[in-house]
Amino acid sequence: MAAYFNIFLIVMALLALAVYIALHYFEAGYGYLFNRKYGFPIPNRIGWVLMECPVFIAMTVLWLLSDRTWEAAPLALLILFQGHYLQRAFIFPLLIRGNSKMPAGIVGMGMLFNTLNALMQGGWIFYISPADYYDGWFSKPYFYIGAALFVAGMVINLHSDYIIRHLRKPGDTRHYLPAKGLYRLSLIHISEPTR
């Protein structure tokens, strides 16, 4: 099983590279670049739930079927992972403003990726990792460093979502580039490095 899992990881990495390259040549058909050639329109709120909930559901199923259900370290990782996707799949869509739509094809690709992501993460955490992999995790600094990085990333993500949601005034439909928070850093140092 571990050999198949390694092949799966390699395929996922190659797909990530292929998508990265492809997006330099094709416009992603969502957001202000919305394009019906990627499928019929779905309201953003529904699209987000459909796109993000498979990872939450699949991870829950993998956890429930695992022999490691109540082991402390896998359970801690599950709580962090599910906390992120609870926010992404069910809370974030409720906060989306406006009446934008996304193409069904983009939603379908998101569902596929998120399902594979759950299989990749949950497969390792609950099934593939060696039996002694989690021994002493809570007595070693890397667990706490990783958890702190995760929480910092989550805070940045929530703040970035807040900035995006508040770019427009009610009724405004124009497109804006965010320039606050870490968006400011990316605009100044990444998008315009000579500035």
Language-model segments: what does each one mean?
Residues 1-7, 58-79, 118-144:
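Helix-coil boundary and interhelical linker segments in multi-pass alpha-helical membrane proteins
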Residues 1-60:
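N-terminal signal-anchor/initial transmembrane insertion module
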Residues 15-28, 84-94, 116-124, 149-167:
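Transmembrane alpha-helical segments that form the membrane-embedded catalytic/substrate-channel core
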Residues 32-48, 102-112, 176-183:
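Juxtamembrane helix-capping/reentrant segments at transmembrane boundaries
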Residues 68-71, 96-105, 133-137, 170-171:
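Membrane-interface helix-boundary motifs at transmembrane edges
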Residues 72-127:
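Hydrophobic alpha-helical segments and helix pairs
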Residues 133-147, 151-187:
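Membrane-interfacial catalytic/cofactor-binding modules of polytopic membrane enzymes
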Residues 186-195:
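Residue-level detector of conserved catalytic or cofactor/ligand-binding positions
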